[in-house]
Amino acid sequence: DETFAQTQPRLNMATFVTTYMDKYATQLMNEAIAINYIDETEYPRVAVMCAKCINIMANLWNSPEEGKWKTGALAIGSSEACMLGGVAAWLRWKERREAEGKPTDKPNFIISTGYQVVWEKFADLWQIEMRTVPLTLDKITLDPEAVIKLCDENTICVVPIQGVTWTGLNDDVEALDAALDAYNARTGHNIPIHVDAASGGFILPFINPDKKWDFRLKWVLSISTSGHKYGLVYPGLGWVVWKDKKYLPGKMSFSVNYLGADITQVGLNFSRPGAQVLGQYYQFIRLGFEGYRQVQHNSMEIARYLHSEIGKMAPFKNYSQDIVNPLFIWYMKEDYAKKAKWTLYDLQDKLKQSGWMVPAYTMPKDIEDSVVMRIVVRQGFSRDMADMLLGDIRAAITDFEKLEY
């Protein structure tokens, strides 16, 4: 009863998180809700399913690693997966510096100001300096040239993002890889790339498979993603995959024997739900590559439709001309905003009255004066629902323009 008046999950256009799975997947996860993944002795098949999921993602991202099993780890979400990728980069750097007899007290990593908050947590918790490259209205993704200017011998990694939370855009990992390759060759440093692909990791392989952003690139050593975003599984579930086992420091593996057998684990958390692993494995074998391609293609088509229609509305301008993920942002035209008696925050509140959650927010540092709105399209959001949302936006604008105060 207490949750009845809340926004219905499928009307929440703010979240990236999966809000729809078919009834069989839902039933499967409900029946597995008591499974603790870490109890591999009791649930050995769940561990095998997890390893198979890691193999599938590694292959999606063109892993060159040989052998039956690829190197990766399960996480509670993409935040833990990012942490694991970051810690691995830090430990590799630290071990190399110690072997060379050099100080290890001033590590740093580089990322754009469009980062997700987990990277701020990573910097604070591990006392690693976060160097940021500003996003601007002219440079709306990570600028490789600006990255190189921030690099030094203490840089543990650079973190490009595929599916920036603020904008929905992708950093150019291929250009960054080329810039880092030249820099590393010139300086003798070995600065790698960790790709934060929380959203894009499950979009690019199906929508733009020829684009090089993954393990095909020399300096990409690890990739993290979210299973509970475009991996199409209910929360919480994340994944991280390394290019090869040699890039996963041994210090990150912990063993216990008090669960009935020797169990080795890579992760910040110990207990974790097994139901999400079953959900991911179900989606992989139920949908297959073609099924995922169709789902993501449909989400992209609906997002493009909304992007086009909102761009035609008199008050608005889209942040980018095209979209590369099923999400986009827009802002109020400057000349319209000067005379308008309403703001995007008012539109957010108005749409909430109809059940929609379409967030309005300020952009990150250096362009924080810009207020935008964002729509995230996910599986379960239909063309009919898109038309309903557009109708409510148009009706809200009509009501606002009648205001006389």
Regions found by a protein language model. Give the residues of each.
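N-terminal entrance/gating region of PLP-dependent enzymes' catalytic architecture
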Residues: 1-70, 355-358, 373, 392-393
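Short Gly/Ser/Thr- and Asp/Glu-enriched loop/turn motifs at secondary-structure junctions
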Residues: 67-69, 104, 320-327, 368-370
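A common structural junction motif
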Residues: 351-359, 394-401
